[in-house]
From Swiss-Prot:
GO cellular component, one term: ribonucleoprotein complex
Subunit and interaction comment: Part of the 50S ribosomal subunit. Contacts protein L20.
Name of the gene encoding the protein in the UniProt record: rplU
Key word Ribosomal protein present: yes
Keywords on record: Ribonucleoprotein, Ribosomal protein, RNA-binding, rRNA-binding
Family stated for the protein in its record: Belongs to the bacterial ribosomal protein bL21 family.
Protein name, UniProt field: Large ribosomal subunit protein bL21
Length: 103
């Protein structure tokens, strides 16, 4: 059984017990969170496709941790000008464990 849902503007395909990183969610570690924007749910040969979402379907997850991803370095180089701009970025994320798929 797996589902496709939307979180943080991205679509994620998940199965029960899977751990994945999402955009940061303001929920404390150890708490449960529900995602109700489910696009697709499958159970064996039974496939439910939403238009746009599957009614009554939800994905439940437990927050495992919060953190920051590795640094991404941005360099803008201007040729022949002896000029360069450097910048770095570390994105916040929330790690969740999928505990249930209903629908």
């Amino acid at each position: 059984m797996y589902a496709v849902f939307i979180a943080g503007g991205k679509q994620h395909r998940v199965e029960e017990g899977e751990v994945l990183r999402l955009e940061k969610i303001e929920v404390a570690t150890g708490e449960s969170v529900d995602f109700d924007q489910v696009l697709l749910v499958t159970k064996g040969d039974d496939v439910k496709i939403g238009a746009p979402y599957v009614e009554g379907a939800k994905v439940t997850a437990e927050v495992v941790s919060h953190g920051r991803a590795d640094k991404v370095r941005i360099i803008k180089f201007r040729r022949r000008k002896h000029s360069m701009t450097r910048q770095g970025h570390r994105q916040w994320y929330t790690e969740v464990k999928i505990t249930g798929i209903a629908g």
